[in-house]
Design a protein with these regions (language model features):
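Class I S-adenosyl-L-methionine-dependent methyltransferase catalytic core
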Residues: 1-273
């Protein structure tokens, strides 16, 4: 007899060959971003909906609760709502949170009774954590079942002048440590044997490749002691807005400078023991 309590997704593995849309390789080659429904790419720095979609198909069931501590314009919660998952998001900037709530509210829910809660707070503070706990109570749960984190790639994009904003961290070390504060704040709310994913890219500064992805991977393992690294996924980057219509210029710069052009980002997948 199948043990339903151990199941973390809605996949019928007796018919596993039917799931041709689900990625199982560590190299993710994804085309144009999904712009259906409430999804859009007006917010510079938001990630493509296909990432949370893939993660939710693999690691959640309908009715589960998904947490995004770096909500932005709401991509994760939009996708959660359309897939029948409850969503909780934390956003530092009130004006961005308002737009996120508007986007999420405009999306149709896959199932009745789906809740989407947006909390305006610094995600490393007690206020943010207590807000998430209150949202869990409102939904009727004690833990979240998936955490998706897509932080700023340090100072590549300046989202605000707020000192609490990770894009304003003065050093890579400060950026990494403050990201660890977020892991520490929320990893204990993750249900046992459930998953946490970090979506992050690297940067190039002062003629040096800065491996932000691996720094955050190590910090996640350090600050979330019950987390186990399960996968390192490499996803292609296409139509990068910062390099749009400048392909030849960047190719020339790469040839002159002896470096390679960023065409990938990482998705680090962890499981809570």
């Amino acid at each position: 007899m199948k043990q339903q309590s151990a199941k973390i997704n809605d996949l019928d593995l007796h018919n596993w060959k039917e799931y041709t849309d689900i990625l199982t390789d560590s190299l993710w080659l994804i085309g144009a971003r999904d712009k259906s429904g409430a999804h859009n790419n007006k917010y510079h720095g938001n990630f493509i909906p296909q990432i949370p979609n893939q993660l939710m198909q693999r690691f959640t069931q309908k009715g589960d609760i998904v947490l995004d501590p770096f909500l932005g314009h709401g991509t994760t919660l939009i996708e959660a709502k359309r897939m029948g998952r409850h969503g909780i998001g934390v956003e530092l900037l009130p004006e961005v949170a308002r737009l996120a709530k508007k986007n999420i509210d405009s999306e149709s829910a896959d199932s009745p009774g789906i809740c989407s809660e947006v909390i305006v707070a610094d995600n490393s503070t007690d206020k943010a954590k207590s807000g998430v706990v209150d949202a869990l109570k409102k939904i009727g749960g004690e833990n979240v079942h998936l955490i998706v984190l897509h932080p700023p790639y340090h100072d590549i994009i300046k989202f605000s002048d707020r000192k609490e904003d990770l894009c304003n961290a003065s050093t890579v070390e400060e950026f990494t440590s403050r990201f660890g504060d977020v892991i520490e704040a929320f990893s204990d709310l993750l249900a046992r044997k459930r998953y946490l994913a970090v979506v992050i890219g690297d940067k190039y500064t002062n003629s040096e490749w800065v491996p932000l992805g691996f720094y955050l991977m190590q910090e996640t393992l350090k600050r979330g002691p019950r987390l186990q690294l399960k996968s390192i996924l490499v996803k292609n980057m296409v139509n990068n807005r910062a390099k749009l219509n400048q392909e030849n210029l960047w190719r020339y710069r790469a040839l002159v400078g002896g470096f390679y052009i960023f065409k990938h980002e990482y998705i680090f997948v962890f499981k809570k023991n």
